[in-house]
């Protein structure tokens, strides 16, 4: 499936791209377009006026989890981290958010969007595994 979003990926768009590939569409392809250039045959995310974007107090990652009925508690734990890294509104306690924000901002400064998505897939795989083990153990893994 063809997916589109805005250029200049940051944490929410990078997290959504990871979620799409890992849980929604393993064959996804990504393009980066202006808000007024969404192709009819593409699914847009994290763009103004589209279904898979910020709604109410939720970031796009949270919206996608709900839209695709993904109920994995680790994904919802990641959603809290992504939300705070993206919005910094203190809605959740997420110690990892500041570090994730810094890493994604730095990668945005040094990589084109397609490369950034590839690199951040590893970041989100690692964060997912860390939070999965933390939930299983009831504490941060060592």
Question: What residues fall within each predicted segment?
Answer:
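Short amphipathic alpha-helical segments and their helix-coil junctions
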Residues: 1-3, 105-106
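Conserved, aromatic- and glycine-enriched, well-ordered alpha/beta core segments
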Residues: 2-6, 13-69, 73
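A charged, amphipathic interaction segment
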Residues: 67-142
């Amino acid at each position: 499936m063809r997916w589109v979003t805005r250029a200049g990926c940051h944490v929410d768009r990078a997290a959504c791209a990871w979620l799409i590939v890992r849980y929604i569409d393993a064959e996804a392809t990504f393009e980066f377009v202006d808000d007024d250039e969404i192709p009819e045959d593409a699914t847009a995310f994290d763009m103004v006026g589209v279904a898979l974007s910020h709604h109410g107090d939720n970031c796009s990652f949270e919206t996608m989890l709900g839209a695709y009925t993904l109920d994995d508690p680790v994904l919802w734990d990641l959603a809290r981290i992504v939300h705070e890294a993206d919005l910094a509104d203190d809605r959740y306690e997420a110690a990892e958010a500041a570090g994730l924000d810094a890493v994604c901002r730095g990668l945005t400064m040094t990589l084109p969007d397609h490369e950034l998505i590839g690199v951040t897939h590893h970041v989100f795989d690692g964060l997912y595994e860390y939070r999965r083990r933390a939930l299983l153990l009831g504490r941060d893994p060592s």
